[in-house]
Amino acid sequence: MTENSVVEVDEGVFESTAVIDNGSFGTRTIRFETGRLAQQAAGAVVAYLDDETMLLSATSASKHPKEHFDFFPLTVDVEERMYAAGRIPGSFFRREGRPSTDAILTCRLIDRPLRPSFVDGLRNEIQVVVTVMSLNPQDLYDVVAINAASASTQIAGLPFSGPVGGVRVALIVSEDNKAGQWVAFPTVDQLENAVFDMVVAGRVVSGSGDNADVAIMMVEAEATDNVIAKIADGAQAPTEAIVAEGLEAAKPFIARLCAAQAALASKAAKPTGDYPVFPAYQDDVFAAVEAAASEKLNAALTIAGKQERDDKTDEVKVEVLEQVAPNFEGREKELGAAFRSLTKKLVRQRILRDQFRIDGRGVTDIRSLSAEVAIIPRAHGSALFERGETQILGVTTLDMVKMAQQVDSLGPETTKRYMHHYNFPPYSTGETGRVGSPKRREIGHGALAERALMPVLPSVEEFPYAIRQVSEALSSNGSTSMGSVCASTLALLNAGVPLRAPVAGIAMGLVSDQVDGETRYVALTDILGAEDAFGDMDFKVAGTKDFVTALQLDTKLDGIPSQVLAGALSQAKDARTTILEVMAEAIDTPDEMSPFAPRVTAIKVPVDKIGEVIGPKGKMINSITEQTGANISIEDDGTVFVGATDGPSAQAAIDMINAIANPQLPKVGERFLGTVVKTTAFGAFVSLLPGRDGLVHISKLGSGKRIAKVEDVVNVGSKIRVEIADIDARGKISLIPVEEGNDEAAAPAADEAASE
């Protein structure tokens, strides 16, 4: 990597650059520019990835704080502009509308490391808007957006302890290097050869340059869709040790990005403004609450059951607030915040000193587990997974591949065959609230569960279905997203989906503090909701028994020692193995498909025969659909997906398609049960096979007697037994009727096709 530098390219326009060296994979250049665009924003930075990818980030702040808020009002928005890819939006109004899933997930990637970097108690509204203005189709913009948002916030004069650097690193393997190399800012083509892909964000806490100490703040990682094929070919599996190596590999890249942002800020940043902060409580309030509540609250926190513990804690809170409130009139909000802080302190102390948790478990214990399948009668697949008080219902629906989601975004993905939707109704925590369209959190949790399962899904050739998986969080007390992974694995197997391996997930936590003069770290397996809120880390790991398929980490600490992280990963694997064993007791192989699920078969026809299968204005394919009741979808490569509610209907449609695409000429003397498709003055045209008609002359219709009109004997739609009398040089077929009772030789294939 070359040294970072900042230059004034024009009057008041500054630019800094970070060059990322990927060795044999080349270099990537990230350039930050400020002073040219969006000059009325508090801070505005344009970030470039090489020459063609360009994002504008603008950070603004309200002039007055929202004193009545008890949270930090930070909003992050990502605006995908279709002109960035030279496209017109596909919506009815041909204008960008609601944000895409990619944009929402990028908002979350930005928010998670930025939010804890602001000073505690800030109540001014802060908005960061990132606009994607140009995008090379080989680039993924999300990590560029993290850096752009951090840079614009760093120069905005806000109480912000950045900069924050974000990088995507992928473990890319090749024929010459099966162990792989961690490559920063990989292209879409390079990701095709990767086994693992992770977005890592962090900041420099001490040092500089190659000696910088980088604290990891956020990780979003996944195994690639083709990881199992790569492993079978000899590639390195993304085990816990490999994932830990990837996190270390990301740190020098993050340091370089932070240095470039800091260099830009040294020339262009505004002085930090005078922003008032509103501490949750003053020291005198905490001291009074601690003196009044410690003993009773400690006792309440030993109750194992969540509902009973919460009820007792609320009871203690009411008693204590009534006791101390007269001394703090008008400061009731502080009392509530102090009580919460005391609860956090006591929970953490108990874990650190006694290795004991609020529900009575040890630090590595998993709550009671339960798994059951076939819960919903008419669903194609369903399962109920319970871990303690967390209860997830997974439901699988199968349909034709044409029902795959069409994606209109700037990402490389245009369709999604596997769709994972996560719902978190308010009753899951015993509360009331809004229901309806999903919130960002629900979209993020669904995406995490989706990424965990994608590597083990069968290919469309192996299983020609679109799959919708819904996770219903019926009860929540810790990691419903990882519960969704477990419930989804069970439901998919119940639906008959041939997964390459079952996947389970677990949420890990971490508590750290000074104990007897040294920093002590305790990793927690299967954290509760309270341990998530009061702990220092939320670390979700999903995978098979052999490797990690998805990982998500958020931490409040300025760095986690490598050995602590490795220990947490090892604990997570042990827990995952235990959960997989419980799941296997419920179901360990794919069930028979539900009778309510469609039967979908994929066949191939020559590309030059696609037009014949469709027919003029869709006449032929519509006729097959009407006769058999099957749904038919034809791809440009000649793949035909045939779906029906039962096997015979699907087979009848397949036979009719094959008769057109791969025809076998009938022979003289063959007999058929045909259908009259047209009558003329000289005879009746009879359909023998799809696309193959013959003529019964009027002179042959009267059983030796002369008839005036064809319609006196048959009409369109009539069934008639016929025999091929002649096939001329042009392939035209002449037919003669066959007397009923003398039709034993009638072609059985024709009988079957006609009877459908």
UniProtKB/Swiss-Prot annotation:
Job description of the protein: Involved in mRNA degradation. Catalyzes the phosphorolysis of single-stranded polyribonucleotides processively in the 3'- to 5'-direction.
Gene source species: Rhodococcus erythropolis (strain PR4 / NBRC 100887)
Subcellular compartments: Cytoplasm
Positions with a binding annotation for Mg(2+): 532, 538
EC numbers: 2.7.7.8
Protein name, entry field: Polyribonucleotide nucleotidyltransferase
GO CC, any one term: cytosol
GO molecular function, one term: magnesium ion binding
Reaction it catalyzes: RNA(n+1) + phosphate = RNA(n) + a ribonucleoside 5'-diphosphate
InterPro entries attached to this UniProt entry: ExoRNase_PH_dom1, ExoRNase_PH_dom2_sf, GPSI/PNP, KH_dom, KH_dom_type_1, KH_dom_type_1_sf, NA-bd_OB-fold, PNPase
